[in-house]
Amino acid sequence: MSQYTDIDRLAVSTIRLLAVDQVSAANSGHPGAPLGLAPAAHVIWKQMRLNPKNPEWINRDRFVLSNGHACALLYSLLHLFGYDMSIEDLKHFRHLGSKTPGHPEFELPGVEVTTGPLGQGISNAVGMAIAQANFAATYNKPDYELSDSYTYVFLGDGCLQEGVSSEASSLAGHLRLKNLIAFYDDNQITIDGNINVSFDEDVSKRYEAYGWEVLHVENGNDDLDAISKALEQAKLSDRPTLIKLTTTIGFGSLNAGSHSVHGAPLKADDVKQLKVKFGFNPEESFVVPQEVYDLYNKSTIEPGIEANKQWDALLDAYVGQFPELGAEVKRRLAGEFPEGWESKLPTYTPEDSAVASRKLSEIVLDNVFDTLPELLGGSADLTPSNLTRSKGAVDFQPPITGLGDYSGRYIRYGVREHGMGAIMNGISAFGANYRPYGGTFLNFVSYASGAVRLSALSGHPVIWVATHDSIGLGEDGPTHQPIETLAHFRAIPNLQVWRPADGNEVTAAYKVALTNKHTPAIIALSRQNLPQLQGSSVEKAVKGGYILQDVDQPDLAIVSTGSEVGIAVEAAKVLAEKNIKARIVSLPDFHSFGQQSKEYQLSVFPDGVPILSVEVLATSGWSKYAHQSFGLDRFGASGKGPAVYEKFEFTPQGIATRAEKTVEFYKGKQVISPLNTAF
Amino acid sequence: MSQYTDIDRLAVSTIRLLAVDQVSAANSGHPGAPLGLAPAAHVIWKQMRLNPKNPEWINRDRFVLSNGHACALLYSLLHLFGYDMSIEDLKHFRHLGSKTPGHPEFELPGVEVTTGPLGQGISNAVGMAIAQANFAATYNKPDYELSDSYTYVFLGDGCLQEGVSSEASSLAGHLRLKNLIAFYDDNQITIDGNINVSFDEDVSKRYEAYGWEVLHVENGNDDLDAISKALEQAKLSDRPTLIKLTTTIGFGSLNAGSHSVHGAPLKADDVKQLKVKFGFNPEESFVVPQEVYDLYNKSTIEPGIEANKQWDALLDAYVGQFPELGAEVKRRLAGEFPEGWESKLPTYTPEDSAVASRKLSEIVLDNVFDTLPELLGGSADLTPSNLTRSKGAVDFQPPITGLGDYSGRYIRYGVREHGMGAIMNGISAFGANYRPYGGTFLNFVSYASGAVRLSALSGHPVIWVATHDSIGLGEDGPTHQPIETLAHFRAIPNLQVWRPADGNEVTAAYKVALTNKHTPAIIALSRQNLPQLQGSSVEKAVKGGYILQDVDQPDLAIVSTGSEVGIAVEAAKVLAEKNIKARIVSLPDFHSFGQQSKEYQLSVFPDGVPILSVEVLATSGWSKYAHQSFGLDRFGASGKGPAVYEKFEFTPQGIATRAEKTVEFYKGKQVISPLNTAF
């Protein structure tokens, strides 16, 4: 006998029609997928552990809509399941300033991650599942199961075609993340028409190859029992599960099964016949029968609120039983670092030896790794180059492999930069103050552009340990030497882009990156050794930019970053011999500097002083802070690092020559600070 | 009985040792993969159709080293097979300015594509296979088989982990590209150690799921016959083939099978024992026994040169038999467009109606598609949005699907932007003047950053039709609205980044992009309608920037792009009412403008005139041409396009206000053109 009755079917129809009404009201949006996916949504959400009054509850189940364009479905669910989402909000679907934007946005209660760019959501979900497994392995104790939640995902063909989902899914299979259950909306339709124009692979077989459990629900349009049965079976698996759900896009619509229902509102007539078909009044919109509210209230909301209460009590008992761990959990849930953690950060003096900044980064990570259990690090298969693995770290691995366990905090991401970026976003979105970091070469952070952008947009404070940050990497040549990379990332809003010049600046970069709760950071680090600079300090560098070395009445300021700062210091000596007085400014992070007071910024770059920037990367973007720029607006070259620097004249003499020309150029001219702008 | 003898084994050892000697001489590089892959390289290259004296021969077989770090192997092969690569060149491996850089570079004879960034090579190879299939289907006639070449690929675990290779491989399976044969170096090692730390999926099963033929050679280290047998079997398949080749990384070395031989030179002792093991003098380096030269000369080089001769004769006969097609082939091989093709390009006057620039792009493509058979277009599943499919185009599809055929010139890429980018590079690298273009939303070109960068670095003139180019796309919201995107791409050397303002500028963008043989282009196009502007013309717009509307003695210049140019024109009217005289400059492409004479550039942006830039994207990079910038240095918002423009004040009044402040700011100040620089 079915566990589902007419009231369940009414609920499914309600979800469907609420979604259709939103799209019609906006005259914009995607009605097709919600119509096909409502039954699965009903089955999943009805049994989910959630508390709409406390959407941040750490032991909630999570639901990720990887096909984010189907957001009218998600908003309908949020309304029906008691979240802060009114019928009025639904009526303002896709309106400017509404709580129902065109794709789900992370800051809305009940929205677990921002989705829309395809392939990201499923990859975020892998990150959430990793975080849950780590949290559980770290804190659960017999009789104190603090964490046992699931992550559910909806994804469509588009998500499956994107490489980022392939990367993340392959890793999820390796990691045997049994807390991850994904529903693949097998509706055979994409924007270009029938999926067979571009995609006839055997998805189930591919996911089996990744090591996933794969199930199939043949009638996703109607068969609630089959969906429920698959869900129960998935929970029994010791692996992540993909449930292939064969559905009809736009189910019930006159154009059901065609791509015309994918991304455009249904015609008025169509909406009417749909309502009649589902037993609703065709003249009414945004209708929720009281029985449906009652159903979900009883099935899900009340039990969820109760479960949250019991969990709170469990946590209190846990704190009593395991005071140290309990305090740590409470601290992490409050989003605070342990008191005095910064004392672990190293500082340097000019007497200390020259060290590659990737190595300096390793020292920071080594020093704080034990103090900050929320650090969950890794590398995209460049561990010995990125130096991202803290001494004594345990790998995050399924215990069965014998290579580590789930309490381990070092992830072997494989050569999967984009997947790593999206997974880090998911780890961060899980909560519990998780701070993911991941290593690769700076040039290959670009492979993950799609995920980096979403970190910034959503405010996930993930950290990229981006080593080999210039032509200084040498022989690997132009395919590996970043040129445009920092210009690209500096143009992304809400993103720190650090390029520290020495030990103190590396410490500053991590200090700011870790302290900030809503801004991701890319830390660009050198392969080659860098001297510890006279004039640098953590206190100054956390400002993002500061006067490293000064002179009375400078003839010019040379502003630089990373490996070129030390060369600029040498250039100042060459200039001094010619009686040209140069102020040296180090500007390790534009974003942090931009947050300082105008007064402070002007003290660094005042009117009257010509400014020359020096950075061995594209000059684009530098005129925000400089009048003249010495950079590399061409691709690099393969050769020994110092030889390549020499070739492009990034030497004390090469800088001094350009500085001289800069001084000459501005002689007798009025020099306005680039910080003084018209509006 | 084996077809291979001692001389073959000597040749394999020679390849191995030449690679090891290169890495040792450079004291930098990757000896491991060449040692494992030399036997397969020997078997493949020995039977390849190639002419080292004419590396551009269109009917050559192609070899792509997707694991580009193994380039010492490729350079050894190029030397042994008679290409312009001397022993002296090998001795300068990884030296600045040498012909043997740290990763293979496209411009070197015999190097088919630039590789190194993992996952790209195999995806490029898919593009080459597409181009070959198209070329053959278009021009082959009974008894005139102009094109029947294969593309061979080496790839490693790293390439297989990258999402871009998943995208391209899935599409290759769908397209049934039987001319593509890939050898997967199953050596179980990556930089992080044993592959099982991150990658235990069943690769063979995955490729079967994609629709590939999958074969396995169990002993890739020694078993030349098994390799050869697999190769022959692959040629019989009607699908692309993946040959899993189990090898030992660093075969023969004391550390064979460990990751220590992956990316660092072998120790001197190790090299010596290796030479002894292979029967070479341990005290000598860069040794090639004459028998090995003789072997390859006889097996491959002489037959290849002869085959090229016969092919030349075949083409001559073809021209006689099929004069029109023959002339077309000759024209394409010469890399020239048909005389007068530009006459098909549309022009507009201000009386023509306002049209979205994506639609204007469609008109251009429609107009030239039949004239230019080298155009091979497509979209990443956004055909109805990108408007990339010319009327009457046939889809490039395996005939068996009934959806098109191989002579079709429209590719359904699926939601695979990165794969599309890499495939386009491969299509271009195939030769025959192929001009691939691909559509997606501008924001999602970023997913393909890794491939875009390689287009620019290698000089593949691919075209991105990048629609929905700003917040003007409206309701889809900030996940789809580009902000940093143009700043990113403008910072890449050798890349045109067009953002045309009207019909004439769209024509200019295509004209320049198509005419240029070594520079890729991104053409950013609006979703919303744009007016045909007074003052625009194709002749002016091809310069990349020009004065659209002028006044006598301007108080300021407003420079803008795309959809904002029309608004700036309206702003000028608002300003005129306040007696502020504004010159309006349209700057559709920084790259083309930068190639004009300094004199011309200064005529647009002279000293003495303050310049305000207006573009509804990140301001970063604009100070190259402007003193003040009005842009959007934050993420966008979901809402109707016009409402979002209003919100951010990109209106005539919003621009006029900032223009007024700009004029005010510079009153009494000396204004130097940003084009006048110190060096």
From Swiss-Prot, chains A, B:
One of its GO terms (molecular function) is metal ion binding. CDD domains: TPP_PYR_DXS_TK_like, TPP_TK. The active site is at residue 417. Coiled coil: none annotated. GO terms for cellular component: cytosol; nucleus. InterPro entries: THDP-binding (IPR029061), Transketo_C/PFOR_II (IPR009014), Transketolase-like_C_2 (IPR055152), Transketolase-like_Pyr-bd (IPR005475), Transketolase_bac-like (IPR005478), Transketolase_BS (IPR020826), Transketolase_CS (IPR049557), Transketolase_fam (IPR033247). Substrate binds at residues 30, 262, 358, 385, 468, 476, 527. Binds 1 Mg(2+) ion per subunit. Can also utilize other divalent metal cations, such as Ca(2+), Mn(2+) and Co(2+). Binds 1 thiamine pyrophosphate per subunit. Its cofactor is Mg(2+); Ca(2+); Mn(2+); Co(2+). Signal peptide: none annotated. It is an enzyme of class 2 (transferase). The record marks 30, 262 as: Important for catalytic activity. Keywords: Calcium, Magnesium, Metal-binding, Thiamine pyrophosphate, Transferase. It catalyses: D-sedoheptulose 7-phosphate + D-glyceraldehyde 3-phosphate = aldehydo-D-ribose 5-phosphate + D-xylulose 5-phosphate. Mg(2+) binds at residues 157, 187, 189. Its EC number is 2.2.1.1. Thiamine diphosphate binds at residues 69, 116-118, 158, 187, 262, 417, 444. Pfam families: Transket_pyr, Transketolase_C_1, Transketolase_N. Catalyzes the transfer of a two-carbon ketol group from a ketose donor to an aldose acceptor, via a covalent intermediate with the cofactor thiamine pyrophosphate. PANTHER family: TRANSKETOLASE (PTHR43522), TRANSKETOLASE 1-RELATED (PTHR43522:SF2). Homodimer. This is Transketolase.
